């Protein structure tokens, strides 16, 4: 016949024991012993169950409990008994005087079991483990993968630096090509038919760009370097076009040293550098240093003002030099 069921313990205290409860339990056991743990709580005046009183006495309050570290002999005894009995901690504790089953169980889980695993033994059978060799191939593959990953991590900074240097080189080449292609693209966008409507400053800038493409022409523009300043104060003259002869614009009584033209006079570029249309009433001021090394022009600082009516006549005497006021110079100008 089995043990009778435990009565209702809804009103019993649970949780940690207090020093007062420990003292009551020790005094009762020392005087009367522990004949029945189920009846002991009421006899000792404790609001606890019998099992709680038994565990408290056996694991903590018993006077013959041995404290401290386990000796090597105790460790070997636990290993031998566990290989035969298994996890029967109470039976093992009976073979070790002064040690409780709870203490032996904790010592096994925290020390002895890990020690057997490190030595290559199965903690349940105490025999060498054979499952290690079954997973050896997986361990080898994992090791090779980790080694490759480490090598990749070590090589990544070098590859990244190489990639950055390569990108910088490509960007430098791209900027160089853009710089080399910029003058030709700008000169191709210039329309010679729009010179009459563009300002004088834009015309000069366009002439700078287009002058580099006319080096093959046999035009001798050396006279501009020496005599351009003599005509920077002249009033507005007609723009030279394809239907006009140079003799109708330039004076005929000047020396040939002043104006040198090539045999191919039709190759003269139509560019109003210092010639302007007298019908224009908008003054255009140019304060640029024109440097054309290909045609012998070193430094020309001109301030050209084109106006109409009496304003140009009033300022002519103040702006023109005396040797240019001679009537013989303008006798052939229509």
UniProtKB/Swiss-Prot annotation:
Is Metal-binding one of the keywords? no
Q: Which residues bind DNA?
A: 37-61, 89-112
Where primarily located?
nucleus
Q: Name one GO biological process term.
A: suberin biosynthetic process
Record's note on what induces expression? Induced by gravity in roots.
Q: Which GO terms describe its molecular function?
A: cis-regulatory region sequence-specific DNA binding; DNA-binding transcription factor activity; transcription cis-regulatory region binding
Q: List keywords of the entry alphabetically.
A: DNA-binding, Nucleus, Repeat, Transcription, Transcription regulation
Q: In which tissues is it expressed?
A: Highly expressed in roots and at lower levels in stems, flowers and siliques.
Q: What does this protein do?
A: Probable transcription factor.
Tell me the subunit arrangement.
Answer: Interacts with FBX5.
Name under which the protein is recorded: Transcription factor MYB92
Source organism per entry reads Arabidopsis thaliana (Mouse-ear cress)
